[in-house]
Amino acid sequence: MSKKLQQISVPLISVILGILLGAIVMWIFGYDAIWGYEELFYTAFGSVRGIGEIFRAMGPLVLIALGFAVASRAGFFNVGLPGQALAGWVMSGWFALSFPDLPRPLMILATIVIALVAGGIVGAIPGILRAYLGSSEVIVTIMMNYIVLYVGNAFIHSFPKEIMQSTDSSIRVSANATYQTPWLAELTGNSRMNIGIFFAIIAVAVIWFMLKKTTLGFEIRAVGLNPNASEYAGISAKRTIILSMIISGALAGLGGVVEGLGTFQNVYVQGSSLAVGFNGMAVSLLASNSPVGILFAAFLFSVLQVGAPGMNAAQVPSELVSIVTASIIFFVSVHYIIERFVKPRKQLKGGK
């Protein structure tokens, strides 16, 4: 099996196994798995609104997954995406609520820049610690998730009462600040599809070009493969790691503001780290950190997310719906194990 075919087959096997495991669990508990999946796909694709919701869910997933991919290419396992996304959401939300009368083009541009900066700063901290102190990026980024979560919640509680709907939730941002637009809502049956999907598509093209066609992209890939050899070749591994984490965090921050101002249109206290951050990691892993592949992986995850409530029509309880989704994520997480058993033939012959 060629390397290219392997890169395609491994994610496909992961998805098929996840769907099969979900079906087996449903059958064990006496539910009709075929009916359940029919309802899932009907809910996702059976209406224009459902399709709009798929594209709505894709926006933040693609952006956050791209952030994970950039860090991974540099050899950095960025578990801090939920915190970086939340930083972008909270800071941009605060700005939008504080200056509601800002003209829409300027407001959108300002919230994008603020999200990029906030996410980039949160991403830079573990990058600096890894580059100069050799700290474990996994531990540091996990701790950063908690720091951003609780600092963000405290910051929201300090908002002026005029912009708060309740103790834990702000009012909606103004029409100038929301990423939803009337023409997209009308086009997609009043779904929450927003301009975030366009940001995501542009980001895919930019990140693909950066990784494949620029000096920085070459340096990121070189450091990810062998930082010591990169240093010997004149590439600063420390600088590259920090830059990759700034870019990774910035993309996650942009994903966060797309989720916040595109889906919810407000800011509120979070009980735990953003699930969309971890889902973005799974999307990138499923796509083997390929920018183009991330689009397709995010589409699959969005279909599952939008279609899952429809499985209740097949009398499948919500707990089993969650198991189906978790099964996909599980096999995505272990697809590297599958990859070990689907090696290219040339590698197998070399091993002999």
Residue ranges and their predicted role:
Residues 31-35, 72-89, 131-140, 219, ...:
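Short, non-helical or kinked segments that cap or interrupt transmembrane helices
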